[in-house]
């Protein structure tokens, strides 16, 4: 055996976080790293939106130098129906979870399932803090980034601004970040709580919906790649944060017993 074979290069080792808090930190800094990449290279957003944009000849009333056209998938009835179903699905799931949580607290003593109640509270809390509060109330209402269909490079009237910029002129319900992608990311997180007996049946369709939802928003010209990526990932960050918080509280209670 040669010295070379004894010391064979094995390549970089990717280590998974050992704790939930470690997973939260990894996801948190990944979110900021991706935002930095999208801000430094705004052409990424423009390129991927151009893949779904179909330019047309402008009519005589258009100003010189105008870009005319649209996003064909936006006008598809089938895709719009699919988008509506995917949009409502997370909130239907949330209603069922709230009902199950009420059922949990109707039990007392030995019949009360504390772990199940904790998981339901984490799931519902992540939806309220992430997609509802952080994304729809704070980011989309105050960051002012125009959607692709609103920008002049895709036939709109407003100027393009990069991800995270506050310089945009969108007034309300803006592009940064995608609320539907955030809800899809939240739905994906719930797979952590799926019993093993149901995983083979539920994981493929839920994962597919979680990916197709942001992909459709991109193809409709409703969001840029950065909007759907960061929106989707934001739910994972919030979910991991709440899991880490509740686990630390549970460990503290156990240590006091």
From Swiss-Prot:
Transmembrane spans: 21-41, 85-105, 119-139, 174-194, 201-221, 225-245
Pathway where it operates: Bacterial outer membrane biogenesis; LPS lipid A biosynthesis
Membrane-topology annotation of the record: Multi-pass membrane protein
GO cellular component: plasma membrane
Keywords from the UniProt entry: Antibiotic resistance, Cell inner membrane, Cell membrane, Hydrolase, Lipid A biosynthesis, Lipid biosynthesis, Lipid metabolism, Lipopolysaccharide biosynthesis, Membrane, Transmembrane, Transmembrane helix
UniProt superkingdom: Bacteria
Pfam families: PAP2
Major subcellular site: membrane
Stored InterPro entries: P_Acid_Pase_2/haloperoxi_sf (IPR036938), P_Acid_Pase_2/haloperoxidase (IPR000326)
EC number: 3.1.-.-
Molecular function per GO: hydrolase activity
Keyword Lipid biosynthesis appears in the UniProt entry: yes
Leftover remarks: In this strain lipid A lacks phosphate groups, instead contains a galacturonic acid moiety at position-4' in place of the monophosphate group found in E.coli.
Protein name per Swiss-Prot or TrEMBL: Lipid A 4'-phosphatase
Source organism per UniProt: Rhizobium etli (strain ATCC 51251 / DSM 11541 / JCM 21823 / NBRC 15573 / CFN 42)
